[in-house]
């Protein structure tokens, strides 16, 4: 499975094409729209979310509510494009229209792709960079992830995400009875946090940052239950599933670090407190006493829950902008201000769920058969029985 996205933040639409989705997967627009709505929620979001009410159009690859094995094309329109038709339109501008158009962006924002991208592609107007590098693109990544989640759900695999930390405020209560309980609690939290008291403090931290013209980041965690043992590979570096998961999470806008399981904490513990003892019982087969490895060893799943964390830096667009340099005059100025969020960590947890779900679904489809959902399901059932008796 693979996908590609296209579209700019204030262009007419965002598009993604998904290839390799097996035939026979039940899929309707509401499945995807539910995930898009989750992405748009979250304390600290900016005014753009009041304009956009994201709804997907499935334009190929699905017939009568079932995937047919062909590429799936998904489109999400940008309602805000109505205000940007001249600035972001594809048609050439007249000389008069160029004069009337807003000035070019020549002051790169520290922390963004603006300057590096402008140098790479030779853009004197950095809007060409910031429009594509915007996190608005994650809209269709979440759409792709929604399809991957459907694949996983059909195979009995559950995905959930939550926020562990925002702006230095860390959740103390992170335990849960079932993944359904985790989902229920976090869906009711404006910051997608399991710890209610910490959630209130996180919201206050966001308010304080917004009032001062600043932004704050945080840490999100994705948990996946039900993965079979042995998905991934130890044979080649580029087939290791933990490497693919790390790359996927790091590809999310503003993410600067990834942990799997206890992650960096492993550096502070002796091996006896890091590695997970192996157990066996007749009902479950092989299992582990603990899950410090986060469900992955040697590039493969262990059968325990997959646990991935990502660190998101504060959004670089600030209402009290940092110093930068105008590329035309080379003079020092305050960086450009674009409409932005004060904190997008809660929304980023939904994006993290999407990219993790995509990588896991891809690994399952590759390993257990790529064409039909019923065949994949049967192959996994046989594999699980084999693993129990091994």
Swiss-Prot record:
In which residues is FMN bound?
132-134, 253-254, 298, 313-317, 339
Cite the source lineage: Bacteria, Bacillati, Bacillota, Bacilli, Bacillales
Copy out the cofactor comment: Reduced FMN (FMNH(2)).
Recorded GO MF terms = chorismate synthase activity; FMN binding
Q: What is its EC number?
A: 4.2.3.5
Q: Which organism is it from?
A: Bacillus cytotoxicus (strain DSM 22905 / CIP 110041 / 391-98 / NVH 391-98)
Biological processes, Gene Ontology terms: amino acid biosynthetic process; aromatic amino acid family biosynthetic process; chorismate biosynthetic process
Q: What does this protein do?
A: This reaction introduces a second double bond into the aromatic ring system.
Q: Does the keyword NADP apply?
A: yes
Arranged from A to Z, the UniProt key words for this protein are: Amino-acid biosynthesis, Aromatic amino acid biosynthesis, FAD, Flavoprotein, FMN, Lyase, NADP
HAMAP family for the chain:
Chorismate_synth
Spell out the subunit comment. Homotetramer.
- Reactions this protein catalyses: 5-O-(1-carboxyvinyl)-3-phosphoshikimate = chorismate + phosphate
The protein's required cofactor(s) are namely: FMNH2
Q: What gene name does this entry carry?
A: aroC
Q: What is this protein called?
A: Chorismate synthase
The entry sums up its family as follows:
Belongs to the chorismate synthase family.
């Amino acid at each position: 499975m693979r996908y590609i996205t296209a579209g700019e933040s204030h262009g007419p639409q965002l598009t993604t094409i998904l290839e390799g989705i097996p035939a026979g997967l039940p899929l309707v627009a509401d499945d995807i729209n539910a995930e898009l709505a989750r992405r748009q929620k979250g304390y600290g979001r900016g005014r753009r979310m009041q304009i956009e009410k994201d709804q997907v159009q499935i334009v190929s690859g699905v017939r009568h509510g079932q995937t047919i094995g062909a590429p799936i094309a998904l489109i999400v329109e940008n309602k805000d494009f109505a205000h940007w038709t001249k600035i972001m339109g594809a048609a050439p501008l007249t000389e008069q229209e160029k004069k009337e158009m807003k000035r070019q962006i020549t002051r790169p924002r520290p922390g963004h792709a603006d300057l590096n991208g402008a140098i790479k592609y030779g853009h004197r107007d950095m809007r060409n960079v910031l429009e594509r590098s915007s996190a608005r693109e994650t809209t269709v990544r979440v759409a792709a992830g929604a399809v991957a989640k459907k694949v996983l759900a059909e195979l009995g695999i559950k995905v959930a995400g939550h926020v562990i930390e925002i702006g230095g405020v860390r959740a103390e209560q992170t335990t849960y009875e079932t993944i359904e309980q985790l989902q229920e609690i976090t869906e009711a939290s404006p910051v997608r946090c399991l710890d209610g008291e910490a959630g209130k403090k996180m919201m206050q931290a966001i308010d304080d940052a917004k009032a001062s013209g600043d932004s704050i980041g945080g840490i999100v965690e994705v948990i996946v239950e039900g993965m079979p043992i042995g998905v991934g590979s130890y044979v080649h570096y580029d087939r290791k599933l933990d490497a693919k998961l790390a790359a996927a999470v790091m590809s999310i806008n503003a993410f600067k670090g990834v942990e799997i399981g206890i992650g960096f904490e492993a550096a502070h513990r002796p091996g006896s407190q890091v590695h997970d003892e192996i157990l066996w019982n007749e009902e479950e087969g092989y299992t582990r006493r603990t899950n410090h490895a986060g469900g992955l060893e040697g590039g493969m799943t262990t059968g325990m829950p997959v646990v991935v964390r990502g660190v998101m830096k504060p959004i670089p667009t600030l209402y009290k902008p940092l110093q930068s340099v105008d590329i035309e005059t080379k003079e020092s100025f305050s960086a450009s201000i674009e409409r932005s969020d004060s904190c997008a960590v809660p929304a980023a947890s939904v994006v993290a769920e999407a990219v993790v779900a995509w990588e896991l679904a891809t690994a399952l489809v590759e390993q257990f058969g790529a064409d039909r959902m019923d065949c994949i399901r049967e192959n996994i059932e046989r594999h699980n029985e084999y693993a129990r008796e091994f």
